[in-house]
Amino acid sequence: RYMEQVSRIQRPHSVVHENDFVPAFPLASALGPDGRVYTPADREHYAVNVFRPDGTLEKVITRPDFETWHRDKRDMRRITALFESWAGQNPATWPRFDLKDTERAIAALHIDGQGRLWVQHSRSNRDVPDGVFLAFDLYDSDGVWQREVRFACEGNPVSDGVRFLRDGRVLLIKG
């Protein structure tokens, strides 16, 4: 077992905690061609656990200068609307939502055909020039930071995503 999170959700509940419904590691894990497993260490920090195929922790890749994106009013409306849609159609039965004031530090992890790690983080779609879809941090196969790579293509970074194919291509997934 590489990582585990136990969430106890009791119904009826008066409080729903964001971390119970949206844990970081299942949403942003990647499997390398050599069997290594890459997962965020937690929700709040830019730290990627790298596990060997036998489950032992090999290393943690960090970016100490990284500051997680703090949600503004628009971000809070978006995440609140998402939780309200999960809660059902009757607002009278909704619990209170315990939502974080930051986005997840690491939004997605990808491993390309060369074994390089691409990190999509909470700032990947923020403060980027017009025409840039997402910015990624690129690490070599040893976990050494190489550079920021910006993807210039059509797309909505909130609703669209990418998948890295083993042959070097990147697939844009709309919607």
Segments from the language model and where they lie:
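Eukaryotic scaffold repeat domains enriched in small/polar residues
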Residues: 1-175
